[in-house]
């Protein structure tokens, strides 16, 4: 490898970085906006249908997060092999992440499809018969889509590992357009309700999966899988992928479970608080799109630098990416603070109480995000790109459960505080994450990890 004290020519020029990150910003924004549109269309079916879908979606988000984390492990390994100029090992790692994703998602799909009733009862307890009926229908078709989600996530991650984020953006665009169009036809046109929504989602995920796989097999693709025999397990590569993927999966899973635990507190605070929390949460998702996109792209940039042995470049690009994330975060949140918050809230039919609570939450969110969001969520992706996933997992899980979940339960149940203190718990979690991640980054221990 190249000596850590020397650097060759820059591995990424300005145009390459722009070409990588702009499609990621578009993809993230598209994903959030289409998700909102999807929810609005399903809501026309009725309250029981919305309840059934929302229950299943809480499980689906957990599954997608786990699959995405495993794809991250594959992307880190492939990126480092690309940077180290080992194309055969890079291709082999691509095949292994496909093997892992297909195996896990198919097994999970079978378990969920067969045991969906028991799973719903076990997680959510006794629910109304109508809600259960809608939930089981949606859960079955969601389970059938897991293998397609898994393969799509793996393919998109592998394209990003090569520095190509346009493929995942275009695939996401196609998937979401098909999903919305399918919803419109099947829900409004044929009156299929929840089954129509689930079918549209399944078909859109199938199309996205097949599109990514087709493009991954093109002759000019550096990570194409030439033969089905390439998918046979390679224990050494699987171990390297899981070294990053398993901690990231545990981190994402525990984070999602923690969020669900905290969200249950909101339901005890009344209808206005529930509405304010939901609307403020949706709007805030848009504000962090640029910083989130930088974090995803960091897996490619930092991973390839470290694979090439360019530790100096890895640190320089990391600082540049973190600065870029802060610039995007400041642009979005200052815009929110001065005018976007009120504009966005006006799109929702909120009561005066809910509007006031939502606006208060957004102002606090804007102010705290300016300081803490990129160091809490963009920076750990830089550490993961170096293979430091076990550290980010440990910090994130402890911070979530000690500083967010425990704090929120204490403030709401013991001291009878309101919705703002649930968000204060979230901000406290961010502060703790930022502290530990920044110390880790400055000390440089993250660059001592060995992935390949």
Model-derived segments and their meaning:
Residues 62-65, 179-183, 209-213, 286-289, ...:
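Hydrophobic transmembrane alpha-helices of multi-pass small-molecule transporters
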Residues 14-33, 37, 59-66, 144, ...:
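Residue-level signal for short hydrophobic patches within transmembrane helices
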Residues 19-35, 141, 175, 204-208, ...:
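Transmembrane helical elements of multi-pass membrane transporters/channels
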Residues 50-110, 149-168, 274-340, 373-396:
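Small-residue-rich hydrophobic transmembrane alpha-helices
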């Amino acid at each position: 490898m190249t000596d850590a004290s020397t650097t060759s020519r820059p591995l990424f020029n300005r145009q390459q970085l722009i070409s990588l990150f702009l499609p990621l910003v578009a993809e993230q924004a598209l994903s959030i906006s289409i998700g909102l549109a999807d929810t609005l269309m399903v809501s026309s079916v009725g309250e029981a249908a919305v309840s059934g879908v929302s229950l299943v979606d809480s499980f689906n988000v957990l599954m997608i997060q786990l699959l995405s984390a495993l794809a991250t492990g594959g992307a880190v390994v492939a990126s480092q092999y690309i940077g180290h100029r080992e194309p055969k090992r890079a291709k082999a790692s691509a095949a292994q992440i496909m093997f892992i994703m297909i195996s896990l998602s198919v097994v999970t799909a079978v378990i969920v499809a067969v045991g969906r009733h028991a799973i719903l009862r076990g997680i959510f307890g006794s629910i109304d018969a109508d809600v259960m009926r809608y939930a089981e229908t949606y859960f079955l078709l969601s389970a059938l889509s897991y293998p397609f989600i898994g393969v799509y996530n793996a393919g998109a991650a592998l394209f990003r590992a090569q520095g190509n984020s346009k493929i995942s953006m275009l695939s996401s665009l196609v998937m979401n357009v098909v999903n919305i169009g399918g919803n419109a036809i099947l829900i409004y046109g044929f009156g299929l309700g929840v089954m129509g929504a689930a079918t549209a989602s399944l078909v859109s995920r199938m199309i996205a999966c097949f599109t990514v796989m087709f493009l991954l097999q093109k002759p000019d693709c550096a990570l194409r899988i030439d033969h089905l025999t390439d998918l046979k397990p390679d224990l050494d590569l699987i171990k390297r992928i899981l070294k990053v993927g398993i901690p990231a999966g545990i981190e994402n899973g525990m984070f999602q479970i923690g969020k669900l635990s905290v969200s249950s507190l909101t339901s005890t605070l009344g209808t206005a608080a529930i509405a304010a929390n939901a609307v403020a949460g949706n709007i805030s998702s848009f504000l962090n799109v640029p910083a989130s996109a930088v974090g995803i792209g960091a897996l490619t940039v930092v991973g390839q630098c470290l694979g090439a042995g360019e530790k100096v470049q890895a640190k320089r690009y990391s600082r540049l990416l973190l600065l870029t994330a802060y610039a995007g975060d400041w642009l979005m949140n200052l815009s929110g603070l001065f005018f976007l918050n009120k504009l966005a809230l006006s799109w929702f039919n909120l009561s005066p109480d809910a509007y006031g609570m939502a606006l208060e939450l957004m102002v606090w969110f804007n102010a705290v995000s300016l300081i803490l969001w990129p160091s809490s969520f963009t920076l750990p992706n830089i550490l993961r790109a170096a293979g430091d996933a076990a550290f980010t997992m440990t910090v994130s899980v402890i911070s979530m459960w000690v500083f967010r979940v425990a704090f929120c339960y204490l403030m709401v149940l013991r001291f009878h505080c309101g919705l703002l203190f649930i968000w204060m718990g979230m901000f406290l979690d961010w502060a703790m994450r930022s502290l530990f991640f920044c110390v880790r980054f400055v000390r440089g221990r993250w660059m001592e990890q060995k992935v390949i």
